[in-house]
A protein has these predicted regions:
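Thiamine diphosphate
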Residues: 1-181
Length: 181
C-alpha cells in the first residue's frame, strides 16, 4: 500500500487536477455540485484564482444534460470539460452512446471516484464499483488517476487524455480518486 506522501493529500490531488485542467485551458467548465470536488470547483468559480473573462463555469442539473451541452460545444470547436462523480455514469450512458460516441465528438470529462477506499457512504459502492465495467461495455475510453499513479503525473495525464479525445474524436473520461483510495 502506498503512503499518504506517495498519493498526496486531498488538497494536493485536487491541485493536480486543477493544474491539468488549467493546461487544457477550457473555455467552458460544466459541473455537478459535489463536496468531494469542492477544492477543484472553487478554483474556477467567481472569486477563485481560475475564474477569468471568457471562461464560462456553470452547474448542470444532470449528467446527460451535460453530455448534450458538451456535444454542442464540441461541434462549435470549443474547449470544454464536464466534472462529475462516477455514480452519475449510469445517468449519462444513453446520451453518450446515441450522440457523441457514434458521431465521433471529442467530449471530455473528469470523473471523481466514489465507493473505494475512504468512502463514507455505503450506498455509493454498488454503482461506483462498476464504473470501469460500464465504460468498457459502452466502448468509452478512460484513464485512471489514484494512489497508484504518482501525483506528479496527474496533471500531464489529464492534459494528454484531453488531447487523446481531440485526436481520436471520441469521448474520453479521466477517473480521479480525490479521496485517496
Amino acid at each position: 500500500m502506498q503512503s499518504a506522501a506517495a498519493s498526496g493529500t486531498l488538497e494536493q490531488r485536487s491541485q493536480a487536477v486543477v493544474d491539468g485542467l488549467e493546461a487544457i485551458d477550457p473555455r467552458f467548465v460544466l459541473y455537478l455540485p459535489s463536496s468531494t470536488l469542492k477544492l477543484v470547483l472553487t478554483h474556477f468559480l467567481p472569486g477563485g484564482p481560475g475564474h477569468q473573462p471568457g471562461r464560462h463555469v456553470f452547474p448542470i442539473p444532470r449528467e446527460e444534460e451535460g453530455i448534450s451541452i458538451l456535444s454542442g460545444l464540441a461541434l462549435a470547436g470549443q474547449r470544454a470539460v464536464m466534472i462529475f462523480q462516477d455514480n452519475g455514469i449510469g445517468n449519462l450512458l444513453t446520451a453518450l452512446l446515441t450522440f457523441p460516441q457514434p458521431y465521433h465528438l471529442p467530449v471530455f470529462g473528469i470523473v471523481t471516484r466514489r465507493g473505494g477506499l475512504g468512502e463514507y457512504n455505503s450506498m455509493i459502492h454498488t454503482i461506483s464499483e462498476r464504473t470501469e465495467a460500464l465504460l468498457d461495455a459502452a466502448g468509452v475510453r478512460w484513464f485512471q488517476l489514484d494512489a497508484r499513479t504518482p501525483l506528479g503525473d496527474w496533471a500531464a495525464t489529464i492534459e494528454r487524455a484531453y488531447t487523446f479525445a481531440s485526436t481520436t474524436h471520441r469521448p474520453v473520461f479521466v477517473l480521479v480518486n480525490l479521496m485517496g483510495g
